[in-house]
Design a protein with these regions (language model features):
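Conserved C-terminal "switch" segment of AAA+ ATPases
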Residues: 10-12, 252-341, 376-377
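C-terminal engagement/docking regions of AAA+ P-loop ATPases
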Residues: 38-44, 331-519
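Conserved alpha-helical scaffold flanking the Walker A/P-loop in AAA+ ATPase domains
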Residues: 21-25, 124, 128, 158-184
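Walker A/P-loop
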Residues: 24-146
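Canonical AAA+ ATPase core
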Residues: 53, 57, 162-164, 183-196, ...
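Conserved RecA-like P-loop NTPase ATPase core
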Residues: 22, 34, 154, 187, ...
Length: 519
């Protein structure tokens, strides 16, 4: 699927890793953060990837003499494409770019339509348009961000057509903007906080709102933000070690500058690439995404991922002077100094804390993508491990001391964290097995006993082991949530029974019926 060809363009090891990250992002949800020094080929990677992918465009044209004819043409086009007429008039339909032209007194309406999103585009011939189909490389929007840039420089802006002489409402000029490009790279995005905040919303919602015009719902294939490493040379960039808010990006890839010979080889290959036809089309990406989504994950690998997430999202902060915390909480919700905690020796969250939800979802997505790119039918433990290296570094709140222990390298810190996780799994194997079995059976009593909350059982030594306490506590929370759902379900059934009774019963029976329902 062109993955090998794309990887072969870049000779450096970190470029190979980043290439896999980009392709994995492309066949999942398209949100990637690239971290690397200048000259690491970050921009070149995005341009090269977009040039390998093509799509078929239907270029529909129609001449007109007045506004009425434009209105009729767009109305018939909107009906044929199955899109909202007002959005089409304002150029707010993704996959369609509208232009007006006036050459030698001949006025022309042009619709450039991506057939991957609008399969009915060739049928505009039936509406009086002349339609020409052509295969094009996918466009990319690559911009080096500066602190003074305005958001409008990136999202496009409303314009009034000169051809229609003000007789027509404004429409969006979006050709050279993120509202139109399927591949986007904003290099050094974080030097402009206002733009970064706007892009934060765009990455998640895939929407851009234009005051007085409307909203366009985009569907980019890949959104990449690039930033430099955190050191004295790049003071304006975010401190990735403590930027848990960056977890909107599914994948983070670290890219270093290759050796001089690799640089020359890569430049030569990129020059040749300009004359190489695209290798895959846009619909292939959509098909791959569907296959990746359906791919299963090996049970043992998924279970270990859940155990890791549980221990990284649990805090039992307690000091020798205070009563020990019985139930865990999110490390992000309390102010604490881990070095003072009595549980610090068996707590993994002291090294790196992560919010479970996006971490687990992202690792599963990326593990499936990594397995797919390797030609597998299911994601295995090695795929989950590879995904963790893409998903955890930018998402965790790291201990500064732990980062320094690992030479200031976040990737090494991930290795150290996983080594400690594996060590605790082996050391407390029987206790972990007990928690897992109790969780699967819904055995709340055993979980309470492990946590020291069962008044009918003696305190266990394992109750002082934060690693096991975290697993038991998270399992108990899931059991509690299940019980609450069951109770809510029963309450809903009661309410429905009461409603039906009151609708059908006579006045004399009403009070008795309500009392019966309460019981």
């Amino acid at each position: 699927m062109a993955f090998r060809e794309f990887s072969a363009l870049f000779a450096g090891k970190s470029q190979q890793v980043a290439a896999r990250a980009l392709f994995a992002s492309l066949i999942t949800d398209g949100k990637v953060l690239l971290v690397g020094a200048h000259g690491a080929f970050k921009s070149s990677m995005i341009r090269a990837l977009s040039s390998l992918i093509s799509t078929k465009y239907a270029v529909a044209e129609k001449e007109f003499s007045d506004v009425r004819e434009v209105k009729e043409a767009l109305s018939s086009a909107a009906s044929k494409l199955g899109v909202n007429l007002e959005e089409l008039e304002r150029n707010l339909v993704y996959g369609v770019n509208m232009k007006y032209g006036d050459a030698f007194g001949v006025k022309k309406l042009t619709l450039e339509i991506d057939e991957a999103y609008h399969e009915e585009a060739p049928r505009l011939k039936e509406c009086g348009f002349s339609v020409k189909e052509e295969v094009r490389r996918l466009p990319s929007f690559v911009m080096l961000v500066s602190p003074s840039d305005e958001i409008q420089d990136y999202v496009g802006h409303p314009v009034t057509s000169k051809v229609l002489r003000g007789d027509w409402p404004p429409h969006l000029e979006k050709e050279n903007s993120i509202a139109h490009a399927p591949f986007i790279l904003l290099d050094e995005m974080f030097v402009n906080p206002k733009l970064a905040a706007a892009m934060h919303t765009f990455v998640n919602e895939k929407e851009i709102h234009y005051p007085g015009l409307g909203t366009i719902r985009t569907d980019y294939l890949l959104f990449a933000a690039a930033t430099n490493p955190v050191n004295e040379n790049y003071q304006t960039n975010p401190n990735l070690r403590n930027m848990a808010t960056l977890d909107r990006f599914t994948i983070c890839a670290f890219v270093s500058t290759p050796d001089s010979r690799s640089v020359e080889e890569t430049i030569r290959k990129l020059e040749i690439l300009k004359d190489v036809p695209p290798l895959i089309d846009e619909k292939t990406i959509f098909s791959a995404r569907s296959e990746v989504e359906k791919m299963p994950i090996e049970k043992d690998a998924e279970q270990k991922l859940m155990l890791l997430a549980d221990v990284l999202d649990s805090c039992f902060f307690s000091t020798a002077q205070l009563e020990r915390r019985e139930r865990g909480t999110s490390p992000f919700l309390i102010q604490h100094e881990c070095s003072l905690c009595v549980f610090k020796d068996t707590c993994l969250a002291r090294f790196a804390s992560v919010s479970t939800t996006r971490f687990v979802i992202s690792v599963k997505k990326v593990a499936k993508a990594v397995a797919y790119l390797s030609g597998k039918q299911k994601a295995e433990m090695e795929d989950v491990a590879a995904a963790i290296f893409y998903v955890l570094p930018h998402r965790a709140k790291w201990s500064e001391d732990f980062i320094e222990e690992n030479g200031g390298n976040v990737q090494r810190a991930v290795v150290g964290l996983l080594e400690r996780f594996s060590y605790f799994l082996r050391k407390y194997e029987q206790d972990v097995k007990r928690v897992v079995e109790a969780s699967e059976k819904g055995d709340v009593t055993t979980l309470l006993t492990i946590l020291g909350l069962n008044p009918n059982a003696p305190k266990e030594a394992v109750g002082d082991v934060a690693f096991v306490k975290a697993l038991a506590d998270q399992a108990l929370k899931r059991a509690e949530a299940t019980l609450l759902k069951h109770r809510d379900f029963l309450n809903d059934k009661k309410k429905e029974a009461t409603r039906q009774f009151l609708e059908t019963a006579g006045d004399e029976e009403t009070l008795a019926g309500v009392e019966l329902t309460r019981q």
